[in-house]
From Swiss-Prot:
Protein name, as recorded: Large ribosomal subunit protein uL29
Disulfide bonds listed in the record: none
A GO CC annotation given for this chain: cytosolic large ribosomal subunit
GO biological process, one term: translation
Species of the source: Nostoc sp. (strain PCC 7120 / SAG 25.82 / UTEX 2576)
Gene Ontology terms for molecular function: structural constituent of ribosome
HAMAP family: Ribosomal_uL29
Gene: rpmC
Family as reported in the entry's similarity comment: Belongs to the universal ribosomal protein uL29 family.
Keywords per UniProt: Ribonucleoprotein, Ribosomal protein
Any one Pfam family match given in the protein's UniProt record, by short name: Ribosomal_L29
Length: 74
């Protein structure tokens, strides 16, 4: 299974982006719990979730920086 593409994250709306970030954080928590109790069947899911979270947070940061530069603060 290939890693998710960042272009998919860039297509999300702001609200959906926040929802996805929350969902991936919950998924990572569950995966860490499974890893600690040695119940993790597919260890690659952990890497995919971390990769997806990094992509989503990158897109969120890009949008915040773009919004800050477009509206000058006085």
């Amino acid at each position: 299974m290939p890693l998710p593409k960042i272009s998919e994250a860039r297509e999300l709306s702001d609200e959906r982006l926040v929802e996805e970030i929350t969902a991936v954080k919950k998924q990572l928590f569950q995966l860490r719990l499974q890893k600690a109790t040695r119940q993790l069947d597919k260890p690659h899911q952990f890497r995919h979730a971390r990769h997806r979270l990094a992509q989503l947070l990158t897109v969120e940061g890009e949008r915040k920086r773009a919004a800050a530069t477009q509206s000058p603060q006085e």
